[in-house]
C-alpha cells in the first residue's frame, strides 16, 4: 500500500528530508541527468533555493521507501518559472496567492502504472486545498502530451522552446479538476484534503 504525505519542510522529519533529498538526486541528477546545482551539503541529496519554509511537499511512500514526489511553491515568493524560466511565458509570470507552482514531480513505482497521475492529481488537489485556483509548471512537451492523454485540462503560457536538448513549455492547470477528484475518490480517498462531500460525489 502506498501512503501519501503532504507537509511543509518543518513538518517532515530529518530522516524523511534526507530520504527525499536522496530520491530527488537519484531521479533528477543520476537518472535524468539534469544539470542542476544542489544547495545540500550532503553529496547524494538534491535540494535547491526553492526548498524553503513556504514550500509544500507531496511524498508517496511504499514499504520500500519513497516512490514519488512533487513540490508546490506559492508564486508570491521565489519560484522556478518566474526566477529561472520566465522567458517561456508570453506575459509576466504570475505573483498571486491563488496561483501555485508544481515542480520536482516524479514517480517510480513499477507495480502501479497509475502512480504518476495519482501524485499529479493529489498535487493539484493539495494546491486547491491551500487556496489555489490554478497551478503553473515548467515541463517538456512530451510530459504535456502525457497529461493531455490522461484527461488533464491545461493551457500553455507561451510557445515551447528548445533548452539544452529538451523542448520545454510553461503550462497552467486549473487546480480543481473533476477527472482528478474522481480518480482519487476511486483509488485513494484517504489522500483527499478538505473536499466537501457535495464536491466529492
Curated annotation (Swiss-Prot):
Catalytic EC class: transferase
E.C. code: 2.3.1.184
Keyword annotations from UniProtKB, A to Z: Autoinducer synthesis, Quorum sensing, S-adenosyl-L-methionine, Transferase
Catalytic reaction list: a fatty acyl-[ACP] + S-adenosyl-L-methionine = an N-acyl-L-homoserine lactone + S-methyl-5'-thioadenosine + holo-[ACP] + H(+)
Similarity-based family: Belongs to the autoinducer synthase family.
Function: Required for the synthesis of BHL (N-butanoyl-L-homoserine lactone), and HHL (N-hexanoyl-L-homoserine lactone) autoinducer molecules which bind to RhlR and thus acts in elastase biosynthesis regulation.
Keyword S-adenosyl-L-methionine: yes
Listed name of the protein: Acyl-homoserine-lactone synthase
Pfam families listed in its UniProt record: Autoind_synth (PF00765)
GO MF term set: N-acyl homoserine lactone synthase activity
GO biological process: host interaction involved in quorum sensing; signal transduction
This protein's record includes keyword Membrane: no
